Regions:
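Long, charge-dense accessory insertions within large macromolecular proteins
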Residues: 2-48, 52-71
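Hydrophobic alpha-helical segments, chiefly the membrane-spanning helices
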Residues: 32, 149-153
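Short, ordered coil/turn segments that flank beta-strands lining enzyme active or ligand-binding pockets
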Residues: 49, 116-117
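Regulatory sensory and allosteric helical modules in signal-transduction proteins
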Residues: 49-56, 68-97
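Short clusters of small/polar residues that mark proteolytic maturation junctions
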Residues: 58, 125-126
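Short, Lys/Arg- and Gly-enriched loop/turn segments at beta-strand edges
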Residues: 101-107
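A short, hydrophobic, proline-anchored segment that marks a local hinge/packing element in signaling
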Residues: 109-116, 125
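Conserved small/polar residues in nucleotide/adenosyl-binding loops
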Residues: 137-142
């Protein structure tokens, strides 16, 4: 195992935290949704290629806690096995599956894999509340039973 001196470790950790804080500020600046710029109903994090969270912003635990599972499931789905292409530069993964790391269908996770030298380096991830994701008249319809009625999987 490689050891890292404490100063280098702290510089790298704070650098990753700064990236996540800048992600958060950029999303607020660019958002047209009051759920984001008024209610802060979103969360940001960075993940390594093994789906381990390496940095997160000070956000909602209900968003942040299940995000590693969402990233893991996305990596599993796009692993290059079972006939799929695998994750490649330029891909963007959008998911809201309540059974694979989602919270409810309106919390949509966006992953943008970043490659360095042709190798997957890091996954910036954002989970945000999307007010009207459903296929029916309202995303909170109490009489809907199948998950697909509320927004598709």
């Amino acid at each position: 195992m490689t050891t890292v001196d404490p100063i280098t470790l702290e510089v790298v950790c704070e650098g990753m935290r700064a990236i996540v804080k800048e992600m958060r500020a950029s999303i607020i600046r660019a958002s047209f949704s009051s759920a984001i710029y008024e209610l802060d109903d979103f969360s940001c994090a960075l993940f390594n290629p093994q789906a381990d969270m390496v940095a997160q912003s000070d956000d909602h635990p209900g968003h942040v806690m299940p995000m590693p599972w969402s990233v893991f499931c996305a990596m599993e789905d796009f692993s290059g096995q079972d006939g799929n292409e695998g994750i490649e530069p330029g891909d963007v993964i959008l998911l809201n599956d309540a059974y694979r790391g989602g919270t409810h269908l309106n919390d949509v996770t966006l992953l943008y894999p970043v490659f360095v030298g042709g190798e997957l380096f890091i996954f910036p991830a954002v989970r945000a509340h999307w007010a009207d994701v459903c296929l029916l008249y309202t995303s909170d319809a109490a009489d809907d039973t199948p998950c697909v009625d509320l927004g598709g999987r």
